[in-house]
Amino acid sequence: MKKRFPTLLATLIWTALYSQHTLADLAEQCMLGVPTYDQPLVTGDPNQLPVRINADKTEANYPDNALFTGNVIVQQGNSTLTANQVELTQVQKPGEVIPLRTVTATGDVNYDDPQIKLKGPKGWSNLNTKDTDMDKGKYQMVGRQGRGDADLMKLRDQSRYTILKNGTFTSCLPGDNSWSVVGSEVIHDREEQVVEVWNARFKIGKVPVFYSPYMQLPVGDKRRSGFLIPNAKFTSNNGFEFLLPYYWNIAPNFDATITPHYMERRGLQWQNEFRYLLAPGSGTMALDWLPNDRIYTGPDGTDKNATRWLYYWGHSGVMDQVWRFNINYTRVSDPAYFTDLTSQYGSTTDGYATQIFTAGYANENWNATLSSKQFQVFTAAGNSNAYRAQPQLDMNYYKNDVGPFDMHVYGQAAKFTSVNPTNPEASRFHIEPTVNLPLSNSWGSINTEAKLLATHYQQDIPASFADNASNPKLKDSVNRVLPQFKVDGKVVFDRSMDWATGFTQTLEPRAQYLYVPYRNQDDIYIYDTTLMQSDYSGLFRDRTYSGLDRIASANQVSTGLTSRIYDDARVERFNVSVGQIYYFSRSRTGNTEAIDNSNATGSLVWAGDTFWRINDQLGLKGGAQYDTRLGSLTLGNAIMEYRKDADRMIQLNYRYASPKYIQAAVPKVYNPDYQQGISQVGTTASWPIADRWAIVGAYYYDTKAKQPASQLVGLQYNTCCWAVNLGYERKITGWNAQGQTSKYDNKIGFNIELRGLSGGHSLGTAQMLNSGILPYQSAF
């Protein structure tokens, strides 16, 4: 099966590419069956507009009534009534300026206005209020999907309300009764964009499958409390699944969605989402709760019927133009949560959940941010060594135009604690004054910078840690002071291209010298520091490591050259960059990692990036980094993508990370798979293969491990009022240490979706592609 899967995917893509079937846009197809109001709109008070009547025969008793027979047409403003016979009655009530005018129509009665069309054997209408009744008739909305029939239909409040007695509603086009909602009373409110149904029976074809004493269906995008579109699917992991979201419009600045999510194999999960808008900003809180999961038995396999949950809080806002508040907090009950359960707030590939709170104040020349940072790592080893920064205070002060100089002072104070009581903890204080001398004109710039990096650590070292000979020898109190000097200059040349009219090419050389003296930092533990990726832009960074625990020495020159091509609309069509770092002396911090323990000098780090947008549909992008200290190509990636539109796309990609780079960047990683390095080739595609049919596929193969990393194929059929998709996914979910093999999860999914209630008519390819463990990302 493993060998056949790429062949199957390639065959499907080949079939799609060479299909000669001409596809019309689904939205256009659906709107062909929806009536439109194509008459000029009449403005003004309808009661003041004249009534025009045409008929083959007329009998009148002026001014009380008149009888019209034969091809009768009654028009007033934007409303038109046609019938075989119409009786017009006019009654002048005492004290009323305008007489009450009504019409009673019989025989093939049709009524239409810009909102709705009605048809039935008998009808009545109040020409003053536009209230209209129709016996045993049919209706269809104008300009949007929605139709049905009823024993009695009423239009009220200038056609805002359609009231049905023993009526039906469906978004399917005429001639298609795939699904419908039947109720003893149905009220469609066009202003609030909702359909309310009492004694509702949901039917597939002619078969009732669901009953509710009351139901609401949204028929637009306006906020209103009520049940949203239900969703049903089947997966091999969870069995049959059914979701019935309820939207609660609490207030203009508060709303919530409560979704009971039934999973045949696991039980009933409650998905709750609350949204708010306040003076300090807007945010979302979510709580997913699954009591007594019938499959999951806990990390150690002994906790039967475990309760599983997710909590999320996201917030962003500015208050009084100076205060800033941001929250990105996610916590789950167990490391396997995102592997077993689908959530928009995280995925298996994240590896951890972020828990960050920040509050900041910004003024003209300074700002301060107080934060709390923590991470829930989804591996036992990673979580036991995770650190919290609680609290962390960052401050910046800016003073520009001090003569020719710009000044900046950065300061930080942080308290680091570990979830593992045997790990060291620390308080860190850092100050970083900087002086810049920027010079620039229209074609170039040069910036000279000098700064001082002063850091103090007060470390709390447990006795068990200090007594372990394999651990680094730390000091309780450490002071580290480092000066830094940098000169960075770049020039931009441009010229018109002879062989492409209107095109412009640039040549942008750049050079930077950086000096930081060496300080041995073996006596400082690593709390928030990792090796940063050395792409082309990274060649011109000040730091090799993120955070402050390691500041590598530097006596180096970084040089680079970028060339860009712009078309006549100033859209960038091509660029290529290549650069290097030349080391006059080895860069080190004092630790014993491979990248820091090399004595090599000279041109050690090379990096290049390129992008080529061949046309509006086809593009290429890639990059590579080489580090002679590790003796290998460290990172590489390449993407080629053809994207005709949102539903027609083919992407080929490759990504590489060397084993030595991974060990240098994440030295404590345990998984042997990752220690081999990463070398993955993949393809992602989506394409309509026939009228209303669309297929997606994704396949990633790890050439190092010689095994598939992810496989996904999905097939969707779309109509104007429903869609169904069938998908298969096989993904790595973990590592079997005992058998030294990857753990796989195979999932087959079947999903049904009701359509036509809102404006969306996509083929569903984006949703299927984003459901995979490696979601699709556009190359350009």
UniProtKB/Swiss-Prot annotation:
It is found in: Cell outer membrane. Residues 1-24 form the signal peptide. InterPro entries: LipoPS_assembly_LptD, LptD, LptD_C, OstA-like_N. Gene3D superfamilies: Lipopolysaccharide (LPS) transport protein A like domain. One of its GO terms (cellular component) is transporter complex. It comes from the Bacteria. Keywords: Cell outer membrane, Membrane, Signal. The keyword Transmembrane does not apply. Pfam families: LptD, LptD_N. GO terms for biological process: Gram-negative-bacterium-type cell outer membrane assembly; lipopolysaccharide transport. Together with LptE, is involved in the assembly of lipopolysaccharide (LPS) at the surface of the outer membrane. Component of the lipopolysaccharide transport and assembly complex. Interacts with LptE and LptA. Belongs to the LptD family. NCBIfam families: PRK03761.1 (NF002997). This is LPS-assembly protein LptD. The lineage of its organism: Bacteria, Pseudomonadati, Pseudomonadota, Gammaproteobacteria, Enterobacterales. The gene is lptD.
